[in-house]
Amino acid sequence: MRWFSIVLAVSCLTSFLFACSTSSSDDANEESLSILFTGDVLLDRGVRPIAEARGIGYLFEQVEPFFRKADAVVINLEVPITDTLSPVNKKFVFRADSRWTPALRQVGITHAAMANNHTVDQGVSGLQATYRHLKEAGITPLGYGISTARQLKPNVLTKGNQRVAIFNAITMPIENWHHADEGPGICQPSADQLTEAIQHYHASWPGVRIVVVLHWGVEFQAQPSIGQRMLAARLAESGADAIIGHHPHVLQPIDTLGQSFVFYSLGNFVFDQHPPMTREGMMVNLHFHSDASITYDTIRVQIKNNRPTL
């Protein structure tokens, strides 16, 4: 724990320094592309009464200014969006109301990672509804498709001559959920399948930067597992420029593998868990520059009243 605290302290100082050094660069280089990533977003259980009483805007009120400054904002959506109950037999089953989806877009969210262990909570029909409601609201779903091949296709963001491909996958089993190669589903590949997809894309589009948003690791563990470290090394070697992790519900360290940045876990963001470590989260803003360099800044948040605060 002491080592982890030191890492976080250094990360905070690094975040401040990066924020200072990249702001002038971004102003001078209008073609830089910035993508902001958040931790886990839940819109049910303890968050639901707050959303109903005060609205979605309240949940993101303090972080919305950061959303507005980025070219894209990617959340990890840990809940299906559907008005029809069709629960899967799981320990924890969530559902968000479709009427809230437009408000997510209004606060500045542009992309939602669907490849996690909770968007499946209301079955295939819930997944399909989630995809539909996100699209109708103008939010791009990630990690979803009608076949494994489609699920493994990235979403590409473009600004000027900058292009960034975002892959989204979950690399762990899901309780009472069977992944089929054909039919609507989330991206749940093997490590080999994901690595090969990154390798193939990198070889086919060498000028496009690659970000992999992963649901992985062990819940409530402050250090990445051996499996996380091994997969991160494989993905970095295969061409991933950055890896963004979710699922542990706590912050995990930042690492650099060659030229690749690895953010093992961003922790929670909009969530209702109570242990102190689950009340901390982090936003990561990746900046892709025209000289092919990548910089980042981190913004730490404290979760109070189930919403991120500064």
Q: Whereabouts are the PLM-identified features?
A:
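Acidic, metal/ion-coordinating pockets
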Residues: 20-310
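Bacterial N-terminal signal peptides
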Residues: 7-16
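Positively charged n-region of N-terminal signal peptides that target proteins for export
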Residues: 1-5
